[in-house]
């Protein structure tokens, strides 16, 4: 399935718009990560534990959006966006959304 942040594919024409698809996950911080993060704020630098959690969360939200698009019979998802928002103290929602479409002359370009 092709996925892009653009509103269309230069190489292909959209035949039918199937509607909004989304995927999300809510994650909470780990008390061990908080301790490490607190120490890192003293010396500065990246907090790799949180970076990994953020990457995994975005990937999970993307996979869930992808699966919803597949269930709808989409060939592609255009206009893909990511958002993050705080839900409760210490937890955040990672959201990925876009527009599922059917393409004329579907050619697979990128995402597997």
UniProtKB/Swiss-Prot annotation:
It comes from the Archaea. It holds the Pfam family YbjQ_1. InterPro entries: UPF0145_dom_sf (IPR035439), UPF0145_YbjQ-like (IPR002765). Belongs to the UPF0145 family. This is UPF0145 protein MmarC6_1828. It comes from Methanococcus maripaludis (strain C6 / ATCC BAA-1332). The lineage of its organism: Archaea, Methanobacteriati, Methanobacteriota, Methanomada group, Methanococci.
């Amino acid at each position: 399935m092709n996925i892009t942040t653009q509103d269309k594919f230069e190489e292909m024409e959209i035949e039918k718009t199937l509607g909004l698809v989304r995927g999300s996950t809510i994650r909470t911080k780990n008390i061990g990560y908080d301790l490490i993060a607190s120490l890192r704020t003293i010396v500065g630098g990246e907090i790799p534990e949180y970076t990994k959690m953020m990457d995994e969360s975005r990937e999970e939200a993307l996979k869930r959006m992808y699966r919803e698009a597949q269930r709808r019979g989409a060939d592609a998802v255009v206009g893909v966006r990511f958002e993050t928002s705080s839900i409760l103290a210490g937890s955040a929602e990672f959201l990925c959304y876009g527009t599922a479409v059917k393409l004329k002359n579907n050619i697979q370009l990128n995402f597997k």
